[in-house]
Regions:
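Signature of the 12-TM Major Facilitator Superfamily
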Residues: 3, 53, 57, 84-91, ...
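Small-residue-rich transmembrane alpha-helices and their cytosolic helix-loop interfaces
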Residues: 9, 59, 63, 90, ...
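C-terminal transmembrane helical hairpin of 12-TM major facilitator-type secondary transporters
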Residues: 15-18, 53-132
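Intracellular helix-loop hinge segments at the cytoplasmic ends of transmembrane helices
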Residues: 25, 130-136
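Multi-pass alpha-helical transporter architecture, strongest
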Residues: 176-197
Length: 197
C-alpha cells in the first residue's frame, strides 16, 4: 500500500492514542477550578480522590463514544463516501485540538464533550479503514492492504503517547498539525482503479 493510506491511519491513531494517554490528567486540571468546597480543598487525600473521579468519568464516558464512533462514522462513510468522512474527521479534530490547546475549551464539561467527539473520530477511523481499503484496492486485496494499515496503527500506538508525554505543553498543537497533514493527504488522494483478486 502507499503512503496515501498508511499516513492518514498513522496520524489519526497518533492523535487518538496520544489524547487517551493524557485524558485523565487533562480532565483533572480542568475540573480543579470547579472545586470550591473547603473540606476538599483543605484535605489533600479527598481532593486527590475527587480529581481522580473527575478524570475517570471523562475516560469512561469518552470510551463509550469511542465505540459508538465506530458505528456512526462507518455508517456515514457508507452514505457520503470514505474520503469525505475522513476529511471531515481530520479537519474537525484539528480545530478542536487547537481550541483545547488555546484554553478555549478548558471548561471541564465542555472538554468532556470535546473528548467524546475526538474519541468517536478515533474509533470511526479504525472502523472505516477496512472499507476504505476494499473500495480502493478491491476486496481481494483487503487483507494485504489493511495489514500495512495496521502496522502503521501499531507504530502510531507508540508514537502518539510518547509525543504527548515528552512534549506535553505542545502536544495538542502537534496532534493538530498531524491531523492537518492527514487532511491534506486525504484531499490529494485519488481513488485507484480497483483491482481484482
Amino acid at each position: 500500500t502507499s503512503w496515501s493510506t498508511t499516513v492518514p491511519a498513522t496520524v489519526n491513531v497518533s492523535a487518538g492514542l496520544g489524547l487517551i494517554s493524557q485524558l485523565s490528567p487533562l480532565a483533572q486540571d480542568y475540573y480543579r477550578p470547579l472545586i470550591t468546597d473547603p473540606n476538599l480543598l483543605n484535605n489533600a487525600e479527598l481532593l486527590t480522590k475527587k480529581l481522580a473521579w473527575a478524570g475517570g468519568l471523562v475516560v469512561a464516558i469518552s470510551a463509550i463514544f469511542n465505540g459508538l464512533g465506530r458505528l456512526f462514522w462507518a455508517r456515514l462513510s457508507d452514505t457520503f463516501g470514505r474520503k469525505a468522512i475522513f476529511g471531515t474527521m481530520f479537519a474537525t479534530q484539528a480545530v478542536i485540538y487547537i481550541l483545547v490547546a488555546m484554553g478555549i475549551l478548558s471548561n471541564y464539561w465542555v472538554f468532556m464533550v470535546a473528548a467524546c467527539y475526538l474519541l468517536s473520530c478515533y474509533g470511526g477511523g479504525f472502523a472505516t479503514m477496512p472499507a476504505f481499503a476494499a473500495d480502493n484496492f478491491g476486496p481481494g486485496y483487503i487483507g494485504k492492504v489493511y495489514g500495512f494499515m495496521l502496522t502503521a496503527w501499531a507504530c502510531a500506538g507508540i508514537l502518539g503517547p510518547l509525543v504527548f508525554a515528552k512534549f506535553k505543553a505542545q502536544s495538542l498543537y502537534i496532534a493538530a498539525i498531524l491531523l492537518i497533514i492527514g487532511l491534506v493527504i486525504d484531499l490529494l488522494f485519488k481513488r485507484r482503479e480497483r483491482k481484482t483478486a
